[in-house]
Amino acid sequence: MSDTVNTRRRLILGTALASLSLADLGFGDFAHAQSAPDAAAQPRAAGGAAFGPLRQIDAGLLNVGYVDVGPANGPVVFLLHGWPYDIHSYAEVAPLLAAAGYRVIVPYLRGYGSTTFRSADTMRNGQQAVTAVDIVALMDALKIDRAVFGGYDWGARTADIIAALWPQRVKALVSVSGYLIGSQDANRKPLPPQAELQWWYQFYFATERGAQGYAANCDAFNKLIWQLASPKWAFSDDTFARSAASFRNPDHVAVVIHNYRWRLGLANGEAQYDEIERRLAAGPAITVPTITMEGDANGAPHPAPAAYAKKFTGKYQHRTITGGIGHNLPQEAPQAFADAILHVERL
């Protein structure tokens, strides 16, 4: 089923590995993470309002910074951000969901904000499997068995992976740009010239010049990505600066560069994730109820909805959000994204 929503007019908020745990995969300590004291910092939401207290918890390899808003006993939704963005993509989505009774958890991914590695010896790995393992470890640390997941960009890929490999942890899924699970083998195949052009930054990051350039010009680089990915989004300097603060994370550059080099097979992952990557390379179906979304002005590389629809074998709907909506759909069209979260369990 497909549905097209014009956010300029519609502003009403609507109401295998599947059986394996992290311990089974050799990540036994992840389920025994301990809470750390809450940080005093409070990320700022839209209009300067507080986006709830920023919390910290040890989970797996990380000490994760996250926002937790809404009733503590409400149904849980995890909202996962992409690159080069941060938790503030959901600054307007989270209050809408909290008002509807959801407990909303928005974590900084590894390499962003206040999320840090617990050991200096841990590889600053950005391969696709590791972010999914991070989030499952966070669920275990928070003692959350199941949740609704929403995401875009890296966050959508991470949510897709969890839904595909740990469906027992996922009630339902909202995924911007649909099915984003990939593999190194698939990424080695050349694309048509216009498609290759869209991935210019990936090829830049493959060089030492690119790594140095990103480190030296991180804010300017990421602001350019925002502009290219969402050409009709008139975000303010303050809006960008609010998210750019998360790029000060000491591991940000290393994680980002490794992510894009790993995709092309130019950097190795870690052996403990090989089995996960092997299963992901097979393109596993996603069986949980899913709404996929796309903005009509997404300037970033993304697949056409028809190309991935058959990957979702459970209850499924696609929504195209019109009105000049780009890549960062939750921040550009928060009501439409929240509406999808509220409806996905009732498909």
Where do the language-model regions lie?
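Conserved acidic functional residues
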Residues: G82, D153, Q331-E332
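N-terminal secretory signal peptides and thylakoid transit peptides that target proteins
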Residues: S2-L20
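Flexible "cap/lid" subdomain of the alpha/beta-hydrolase fold that forms the substrate-access gate
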Residues: A36-G52, L61-V64, V69, V76, ...
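Boundary at the C-terminal end of the N-terminal hydrophobic targeting segment
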Residues: A31-S35
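Catalytic histidine-centered segment of alpha/beta-hydrolase-like enzymes
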Residues: I325-A333
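C-terminal segment of classical bacterial N-terminal signal peptides
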Residues: L22-F30
